[in-house]
Amino acid sequence: MKVQNLPYRLVLLALCVLLCSACSVNRQLARQADQLVARKQVSEVSCSGPQNCAMASPFHALLDEANRATSATQPIHFVNVLEQGEESLLMRIHLARAARHSIDIQTFIWVDDDAGRLMLDELLAAARRGVKVRIIADQLFSLEDAELLSRLAVIHRNLDIRIYNPTFHKAVTKPLEFAASILCCFKRFNQRMHNKLFLVDGELGIVGGRNYQNRYFDWDHSFDYRDRDVLVIGKDVGAQMTRSFEQFWNYKRSARLTRLNDVNSRIVAETDQGHDLPPAQISVDPARVDRLRVHASDADEMDRRFARHALRVGQVDYFSDLPHKLEGSANNHVLGERIAHMIRHAQSRIVLQTPYLVISKRAQKIFRDLRERENRPQVIVSTNSLAATDAFYVYALSHKYKKRYLKLGFWIYEFKPFPEDAPELIADYALLSGGTDSAGYQRYGQAPVTTQGVRVGMHAKSIVIDDTITLIGSHNFDPRSDNYNTESGFIIYDKAVSAAVTAAIERDIAPQNSWTIAKRPRTNLIHRFNNAIGDFSAALPLFDFWPFRFATSYELNDECAPLPPNHPDFYDCYTAVGDFPEVDLPLKTIYTRIVTAFGAGAVGIL
């Protein structure tokens, strides 16, 4: 061994020892924490009745009606599509108070802000009156506070939390640990639980795109999501949700809090630990929280706003990938397989809404096959613009393949950051300050924009097939959802639900809310040369240097009615507004160009 190599070998050995120690649970601390939790946990409940003092709810009557009408051959369910963020949070709080026996939750993100803490408070209240509450939260961006988790571990026996796929058996991942995990355990680190499920008594379930953070519920003062959830009521699909949740709950990567080294060490160290939670990390608008609490207790209001408008439907299926998605056959990719089947058999129209328009090679082949059919279906896509997205790296990859998607026949509409209909899409939009109180998880950053105010970004994930079948869930229809994350969603076979979701998406793609993406008009030989070079550059597997694109964004002229991008009068009625309208800083445009040029190899993981 050369002497000069010795320091490097010692450093490498030290890193290996560090990684090995981080990759195991401290079993002694875990045993001590288990003993302390068993001794400290409160087990008393405030209610001894058979329904644990559940609040009366109009949804109980809908559940009874659905269960009475369901037969062995014909299931019956009731459905409420939840378009507005605050109403989706209101529904969760109301159902938590109406829970009689159990509440089961899966989520990808849980931030300790107004919305996240309100939900925790309500779940704790349910546990204290006798309801069994179970939460599975993906570790990467959920409850990133070991002190809070150590309190939650002992606060009540009926509240049980597990953290999915923790990095190095810890609740909080530091930057160096984040990098080390990518280097040592890339495949496992990237397999995240992206499911969103809120299940009450095994028969009332909310599924969709929303996590637990202010921006998902119209409560962020700088950036809010345009998202979609759906409440489905009935025992038939309830059994499917329960079965899926149990698979995740019992999976080896769902870790009890005492199996997290930064949590169990705190449990053992804090001998005088109380049974109250520490203050929330982020508190923006306590008055708004209090108002929502009042509304959630008003059964008449919940009946008037939601239950009376619930749609009676027949078949509803809940699909979820299996937790061991990466460990076996394609049969573990349950939701992705079902989506592929639905699209492949579309006859007349596909309406797709996704925050990230980056589709897999397999999906591209399916759409190519559809394009070649004699009676090909129309494909309408609603997605984010660069100015609206909070993931500009992913947008840059979409930008690379925009011509390819247009050639597949997609009509693409990119959501504006300040849609004209924002006051109807976002609760109390006019009252939000446009300040900078946002905190917690942000994926890859937002592009600075030219307009001041509360920005809105698309986060809904839905497909409507042939105006009869609707998928609402967590799947982004991208390679990460296909290959790494576990995803879940409802597939609803009902024309009224399809009409409601289609109407919502058509509003999102209306000219006042979205830009239309269309090819640049072919005017001369230079344009054709540019097109040829652009095709060659975009076809390169890793690099794409050509800055001049086949397509750009268009705004409707005031004197015209909306037209599809393939209409012969389109260019008379629309004005090109550039590739990245309303993006302020040239530097962000440069970053986007760089990722477009070099980022193709990251499509599968971004």
What do the predicted segments below correspond to?
Residues 23-196, 200-606:
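Charged, low-complexity intrinsically disordered terminal segments
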Residues 11-21:
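Bacterial N-terminal signal peptides
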